[in-house]
Amino acid sequence: MAVANRVVSVAIGSDTGGSVRLPAAYTGTVGFKPSYGRISRNGLIPYANSLDTVGIIARNTNDVTALYKILDKHDPADPTSLRPESRARIHEARRKRQVDFGHHYLEGEDTKITFVGSRSNKEIPANDSVPKDKYKRYASGYFRRIGVPDEYNIAEMHPVVRQAWLRTLSMLVDKGHTIVPISLPNTKLALAAYYVLAPAEASSNLAKYDGVRYGTPRNPNTADNENGPLYANYRGQHFGEEVQRRIVLGTFTLSAAAKDNYFIQAQKVRRLVQQDFNNVFAFGHPLLPHTRHQNSSSDQTVDLIIVPTAPTPPPKIQDLQGQSPIQSYINDVFTVPASLAGLPAISIPAAIDEDIPATPDRHVGMQVIGQYGDDLSVLNFTRYDIEGTMNFDEARELTWSRKRM
């Protein structure tokens, strides 16, 4: 809220499953989760070690990029921070990719994407017929192949969000980019896997906050009974209800009776989600040699993926208070897959239908997802091709600077 109300220009926060991107989508700001390990987590209270990422919130992509470039460096104090050798491999992979950047931009099948439940039932050409002599460099580089996953096009999506997604893709087609339908089949399992893995890691990480060596000092007047459990009352007083719920859930999934059926299976799903992304990106994972060049010449691969950040506009407090935990977890359905795969993802305010009044409770965020290590491509594309198309000084009104297509 400090960024949204112009109290500060930028802010940082942890993004484990969408905790930076979702607030940004709900407040009309820009929220960026970099690739896992790019920014040091030193000083951050760990929640889920394999998922926690320091993210950035600002009112525009330029400010996000400026802070990211400052923070993007190895920190010996953080064991999850990318080492210089890994950063060098990523840099070299991106440099080689730039040399061949336009080679796979070929005309493919005349496929179309139809949006479920769209008021206009408008179809977007999946392979744009932009003349080949127009494939030249401009502000953000070459024209891109934009992936639209079929699994994100759900019937439960709010009409306002669907229309914003449709208009965003239409604007990109108008600029010369190619829309490519893709499939991420294991996306439907990602949310369930996340809510097994994250609580399991949290139950381990937060166990140390017992008032003995970590946490606030124990108050003798409220300490556990002499013959009772040592930590129960203390932890109950200092952890919120949702945190306690996740600790209990995580402790159960790590138990001998449940570990094989839940935790191990969730780890397998996570690997499948990562594999799905590697299969569709033209830029192979720079730290996984077997994926580095496997897709570079395929006509069905993409440079970036664009999906909504959340399936609904911002929920109201009174609605959240009446939700069950399961209902609240569903809001993470579009942000969790990128977190499981450790990919860079940014949420940016999107244009809603001009026929629907733009009000504070109708903020919509679009999410741009890139391959691991391709953070700057995500930031530059968002800055020049999406943000540059909008009247961003009036981002809260969510209007485009040009007429509707």
Which residues does each predicted region cover?
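Glycine-rich, small-residue loops and helix-cap segments
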Residues: 166, 178-179, 183, 189-191, ...
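Short acidic, glycine/serine/threonine-rich loops at helix termini
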Residues: 21-26, 44, 158-160, 191-194, ...
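Short glycine/serine-rich loop segments
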Residues: 1-71, 341-349, 363-365
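Core of folded catalytic or high-affinity ligand/protein-binding domains
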Residues: 15, 98, 123, 217-225
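Acidic, glycine-rich active-site loops and adjacent beta-strand->loop/helix elements
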Residues: 14-20, 24-26, 152, 212, ...
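A short helix-breaking turn/cap at a secondary-structure junction
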Residues: 33-163, 229-233, 391-403
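Glycine/Thr-rich phosphate-binding loops of Rossmann-like dinucleotide-binding domains
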Residues: 20-21, 90, 105, 156, ...
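Short helix-loop-beta junction
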Residues: 161-178
